[in-house]
């Protein structure tokens, strides 16, 4: 048993020793392989390093060669440029030398000429001295022979020449003036006749009545209303007389103000068509008619400017122009008259080479003040100038308005043409009627007197001027003041107006109290 254990131990020891040497040999073998591999790697790294070193050297040599080549080329270019600059400088130097030589030659030539001129000047001065002495000698001899001094002889000759020339100039001026007047008369007659022939005016005298047709005679009673309240309301609101007589199916509206008459006609037409006729409805329709008339006035103004070819007028001026449709002067419609004057002035301006459109503009606006002369103080010329200035019209237009009646001196040819065209249009046979104009002026004066008093809201001359109705403000005029106002207006009418028969003065003071039930 003990021998077995010993044998086992010996075997174990021997095995351990053998294993140790085997492992050592294996380790040494591995170490040797690793050394060989490391040496091989080192060798390969050395070869790669040598290759990279050679490659870097080659690249460095190539770069050095390129830089050297570029440097040599740059040096050659610079040398070439320097050579060119040197050549140019040498050429400039040669040119300067040649110019200097030429200047020296010219300087020598000029000096020679200057010397020759000095010699010639001295010779001329000597000759002038001799000539002056001879002239003085001859003048003294002439003065001795004629008995006149030099100044006396000059004055005598000048007087004689002046006398002859003055006579000839006067004759020439007289002949020129005669020819100019004859030519101007012929030219003016030709231009006026041509303008009149080319401007055809179709216009008849305005009337002071309008007729409203009725569907039947029963409508007359409804228009009059209970105890005449409807007709009174309509007449009070419009200031127009309603004449209801035996004329079948018609009502006549009479009034000198065409705008009021047109307003009344439209309102009455609407009332007849609607069938409801009572004071409240009448007020509503009259107000609606006023708006329609205002719109119609604007459209008339725009249509007129389009017809005449005048553009760029201020909208307010266009509306004022449209009001001229409802304004007459001696029975002649002022808007038609203004259009006629515009065309006549334009035609004459074109013949004379002036601005045709500016002449038309001045002719169209020459009576613009008549549209509101019954509302604003001053003559229609003053009002027209004020309107044209306010709306920045051309200075020629303003002067044409101011001078067309001779109140101001015309400053342009167009202003003279507008005045001539105005006279032509007014003087045309049948264009105006003096009697109608006087009648309308009397009615306007009636209203002007009534409205000049404080507290008067509106006044209407009706019944062909036989009555004036005055609407007063109830908060300013009481019943006693109304009677006093009527007396004062009556006295002024008697003092300032000439009229046939009697004029009834009616002062109306109306107070309304309105409440709404909810």
Curated annotation (Swiss-Prot):
Subcellular localization, as worded in the UniProt entry: Cell membrane
SUPFAM superfamilies in the cross-refs: Eukaryotic type KH-domain (KH-domain type I) (SSF54791), HD-domain/PDEase-like (SSF109604)
A molecular-function term among this protein's GO annotations: RNA binding
TM stretches of this protein: 2-22
UniProt entry tagged with the keyword Cell membrane: yes
Domain of life, source organism: Bacteria
UniProt xrefs under InterPro entries: HD/PDEase_dom, HD_domain, HDIG_dom, KH_dom, KH_dom_type_1, KH_dom_type_1_sf, Ribonuclease_Y, RNase_Y_N
Membrane-topology descriptor: Single-pass membrane protein
Group of enzyme by EC: hydrolase
Coiled coil: none
A GO biological-process term: mRNA catabolic process
EC number: 3.1.-.-
PROSITE patterns: HD (PS51831), KH_TYPE_1 (PS50084)
HD domain sequence ranges: 334-427
CDD domains: HDc (cd00077), KH-I_RNaseY (cd22431)
Keywords: Cell membrane, Endonuclease, Hydrolase, Membrane, Nuclease, RNA-binding, Transmembrane, Transmembrane helix
Domain KH stretches: 208-271
GO cellular component annotations of the record: plasma membrane
Main location: membrane
PANTHER family: RIBONUCLEASE Y
Role noted for this protein: Endoribonuclease that initiates mRNA decay.
Protein family according to the UniProt entry: Belongs to the RNase Y family.
Protein name per the record: Ribonuclease Y
Protein species of origin: Geobacillus kaustophilus (strain HTA426)
């Amino acid at each position: 048993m003990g021998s077995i254990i010993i044998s086992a131990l010996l075997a174990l020891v021997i095995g351990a020793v053998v294993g140790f040497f085997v492992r050592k040999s294996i380790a040494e073998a591995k170490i040797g392989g690793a050394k060989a591999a490391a040496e091989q790697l080192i060798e390969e790294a050395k070869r790669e390093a040598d290759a990279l070193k050679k490659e870097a050297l080659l690249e460095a040599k190539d770069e050095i060669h390129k830089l050297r080549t570029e440097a040599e080329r740059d040096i050659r270019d610079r040398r070439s440029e320097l050579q060119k600059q040197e050549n140019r400088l040498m050429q400039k130097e040669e040119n300067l030398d040649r110019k200097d030589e030429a200047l020296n030659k010219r300087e020598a030539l000029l000096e020679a000429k200057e010397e020759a001129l000095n010699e010639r000047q001295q010779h001329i001065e000597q000759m002038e001295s001799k000539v002056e002495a001879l002239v003085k000698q001859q003048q003294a001899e002439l003065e001795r022979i004629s008995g006149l001094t030099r100044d006396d002889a000059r004055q005598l000759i000048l007087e004689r020449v002046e006398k002859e020339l003055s006579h000839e100039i006067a004759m020439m001026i007289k002949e020129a003036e005669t020819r100019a007047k004859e030519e101007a008369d012929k030219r003016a007659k030709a231009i006026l006749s041509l303008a009149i022939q080319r401007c055809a005016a179709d216009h008849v005298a305005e009337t002071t009545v309008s007729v409203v047709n009725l569907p039947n005679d029963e409508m007359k009673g409804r228009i009059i209303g209970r105890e005449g309240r409807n007709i009174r309301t309509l007449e009070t609101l419009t200031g127009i007389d309603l004449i209801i007589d035996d004329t079948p199916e018609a009502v006549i509206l009479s009034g000198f103000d065409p705008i009021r008459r047109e307003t009344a006609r439209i309102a009455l037409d609407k009332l007849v068509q609607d069938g409801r006729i009572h004071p409240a409805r009448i007020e509503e329709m009259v107000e609606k008619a006023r708006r329609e008339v205002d719109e119609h006035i604007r459209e008339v103004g725009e249509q007129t400017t389009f017809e005449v070819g005048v553009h760029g007028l201020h909208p307010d001026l266009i509306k004022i122009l449209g009001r001229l449709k409802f304004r007459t002067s001696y029975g002649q419609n002022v808007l038609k008259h203004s259009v006629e004057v515009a065309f006549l002035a334009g035609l004459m301006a074109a013949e004379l080479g002036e601005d045709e459109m500016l002449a038309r503009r001045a002719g169209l606006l020459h009576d613009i003040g008549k549209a509101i002369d019954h509302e604003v103080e001053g003559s229609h010329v003053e009002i027209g100038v004020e309107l044209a200035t306010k709306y920045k019209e051309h200075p020629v237009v303003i002067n044409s308005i101011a001078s067309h009646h001779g109140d101001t001196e015309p400053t342009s040819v167009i202003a003279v043409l507008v005045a001539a065209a105005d006279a032509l249009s007014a003087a045309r046979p049948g264009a105006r009627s003096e009697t109608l104009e006087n009648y309308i002026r009397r009615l306007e004066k009636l209203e002007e007197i009534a409205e000049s008093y404080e507290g008067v809201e509106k006044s209407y001359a009706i019944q062909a001027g036989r009555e004036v109705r005055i609407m007063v403000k109830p908060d300013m005029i009481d019943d006693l003041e109304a009677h006093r106002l009527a007396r004062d207006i009556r006295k002024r009418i008697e003092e300032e107006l000439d009229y046939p028969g009697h004029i009834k003065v009616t002062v109306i003071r109306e107070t309304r109290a309105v409440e709404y039930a909810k």
